[in-house]
Amino acid sequence: MKQLIQTILKTGPLFLVIAFMVLSGCQQQKPDPSQEQKPILDKGIAIWNNGNLDEVGEVWDESVVRSVNQLPDVKGVEGMKKVISGFRTAYPDAKLTANEVIFAENKAILRWTFTGTNTGSGEMPPTGKKIKIWGITILHFANGKISREIVAYNNQALIEQLGFAMIPPKGSK
């Protein structure tokens, strides 16, 4: 009996270590969200950079909603096509760069830089000026596509780089 107790005491810690390793190794690992989301994000950035509007529906969901600063929401694939086309018209050499991306389950946060030369017509007359702005975008994914896009950037920095100025209202001191 004494020998049995000694054997159990000697092998007990080893048994506990093996049991712990087996049980913790059996836990199902969560998939890395970047595996699915990064190719979608990369293709979206490529579309912004090359202007291939035929591929927009491969990246953005039909019911996508895009919110930017305080502007009205853009909805659907056709809305995304108009936004991308508008930027590509105003800035024919537009380049969107992902500086940092954080992937999470069904979401990604993107810190980006946008550069281009304002030689095309858009909401404002072309100025011929080069711009460089950065912003943050929160992307939501569903069914392998972007379903929601929330964008924030400093619009005043953009306006100033284009050569426009903020004029205070009359009567302000």
Name each model feature, range by range.
Residues 4-5, 13, 23-173:
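C-terminal and inter-domain tail/linker signature
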